[in-house]
């Protein structure tokens, strides 16, 4: 399942930072790590390197976009909610974003996430409430928002995972650090030459 934007996406003069909401479930994991990996593959993040981000604010210029394929090995920022279940148990995970306006008229965007052992509807309601609290505590006016929630029931004697993510594939490029997808390697010969 995937979801993106409500069509009323935030605009910012600082440039664009594309992102999208995705969900996935896996109910047949041999263990929690196996279920987690299956969920990442299902969500399209199985071949990416992830930086899981905490905090409420999204990069300036956030814009909801349709999902895009990610190159193998790419470094991707994401706000990830992961909830586990075992042996017939149920788990839910959700992520939401909101485009906002400050009292001074500046545009920004925030994110909220949640994990529960409740059903889909209850989890979605709690997620929306968490998003409202984040808006209220910062005195922000909502312009538009979107949510993504998924629910899993683990198979008998197996682990299950419900995952929801806001994926921001280009946010790390915006930091001025250039290409963060490569690394510099020194061979032992190069290290000897520098010594």
What is the predicted function of each stretch?
Residues 186-191:
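Conserved small/polar residues in nucleotide/adenosyl-binding loops
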Residues 1-185:
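Helix-coil modules at protein/domain termini and other flexible surface or pore-lining loops
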């Amino acid at each position: 399942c995937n979801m993106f934007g409500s069509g009323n996406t935030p605009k910012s003069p600082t440039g664009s930072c594309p992102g999208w909401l995705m969900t996935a479930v896996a109910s047949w994991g041999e263990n929690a790590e196996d279920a987690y990996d299956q969920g990442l593959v299902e969500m399209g993040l199985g071949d990416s390197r992830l930086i899981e981000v905490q905090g409420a604010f999204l990069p300036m210029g956030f814009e909801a976009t349709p999902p895009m394929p990610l190159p193998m090995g790419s470094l991707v920022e994401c706000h990830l909610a992961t909830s586990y279940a075992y042996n017939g148990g149920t788990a839910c995970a959700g992520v939401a974003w909101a485009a906002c306006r400050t009292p001074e008229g500046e545009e920004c965007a925030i994110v909220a996430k949640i994990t529960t052992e409740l059903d889909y509807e209850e989890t979605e309601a709690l997620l929306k409430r968490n998003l409202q609290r984040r808006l209220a505590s910062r005195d922000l006016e909502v312009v538009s928002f979107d949510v993504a929630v998924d629910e899993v029931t683990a198979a008998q004697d197996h682990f299950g995972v419900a995952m929801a993510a806001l994926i921001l594939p280009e946010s790390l490029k915006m930091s001025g650090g250039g290409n963060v997808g490569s690394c510099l390697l020194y061979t032992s010969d190069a290290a000897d030459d520098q010594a």
